[in-house]
Amino acid sequence: MNKLTDEFVLHGRDIEYDYYYTSHRRNEILETIYNAYNKLNIEPFKFVVLNEKSLKAYVTNKKDKKSNPTFTRMKTDHLSSLEDFLKQRIKPKGEINHNGVVGPQFDSDTVYSRHKTVKKVKLEDFKILKVIGRGSFGKVCLVEYLPTHETYAMKSLKKDILIEQEQIENTLLEKKILQTIDYPLLCCLVFCFQTEERIYFVMPFLSGGELFQHLRKFRTFSEEKVRFYGAQIALALEYLHKKGIIYRDLKPENILMDDQGYLKLADFGMAKKLGENEKAMSFCGTPEYLAPEIITMEGHDRMADWWSFGILLYEMLCGLPPFYMENVDKMYDMIKNSQVKFPKRINLSDNAKDIIQKLLEKNPKKRLGYKNGIEEIKKHPFFDKIDFKAVEERKVKAPFIPEVESDTDVQNFDEEFTNEEVGMSYIPKKNMEMIKKNQGMFKDFSN
């Protein structure tokens, strides 16, 4: 078997010729063969580990055997037992064993730990249980922290992609925001560490899954639910705004639910720190949630978040964002020029319509929240029945409790992700060379 790749070759005295395979589940396959072989044979199963770009040069094929029945290309010196191999958990760099335990690879650099008693964490401290999400720069997995057996969500970010897409600075800002926030309605950073290939953010695991999954299941929410969820999101946004942070990517996919039906805002990849009276000029976010001032690139601030909040309220009540169209250019034109319309099939209260219309005001200086932030939201009649302080302190019973059977239950996450194999993707040699050449760009993650 190859120490550098997923290759392995089956070779034996009684086998006509060698069998060559490549599989990310190699360890699992070999362990199965090992158990079956040892039941039928007295002599234990043996193997050879090679450090090669490819094992193809060591494969004895049909043509070789036909020319010379005793010929073999296989190296049979330095044979070892499979037990030794399985103990070592030899895997290609960046890979994870079939049972989810991360194999030895690089020394980890612990960048941040929220727990004062834990000074250092490394990849080997975590067992990967399930894939629960995927983003532009990597995947999110449910993991078990082996020293305490606690479950967390671990977001892995591939350094080669961060370099190629010039996202190192944004990722560093995301890390700084995650480690400084301390608020019950926001996902915070528990650990952060890096290896040669990746950066890892470890955060609380919220077993209720994305709000998006529940909205897709129920299609729309009642006004009671929307008031409860809206109050939490408004509080989370106001917390960020008071710290000079604009969120800029509000959508149901970035809102997570815990097992008690409460929400947390997650994923700060688009967030930005702004000074007083400063405006951001970049064009970023999810198209159907973009405020007009982002599309026109006239400069935006916290008011862009309140626009997105209005879009979110509409989507929760009506099932789709108000200006959604498959043609993005036409959608942008509608966002800039069209007034919001409400579907007749849904019986919305006047208060629900009014708050949405005031949040979706094209002029940010006339938009609800411009003068006095969340206080204007709280005072709107739509939220009359909500005690914001009680919601913040989790004293209000959630109108919906997600079904959760255990600490590792992932039924509330998309099966597209949870059915994936729990392995880290292979990073090509040329990309590894690029990472090594630019490793200095990640030094600030250790500060």
Go through each PLM region and give its residues.
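Activation segment signature within eukaryotic-like protein kinase domains
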Residues: 229-230
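Conserved N-lobe beta3->alphaC-helix segment of eukaryotic protein kinase catalytic domains
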Residues: 151, 156-182
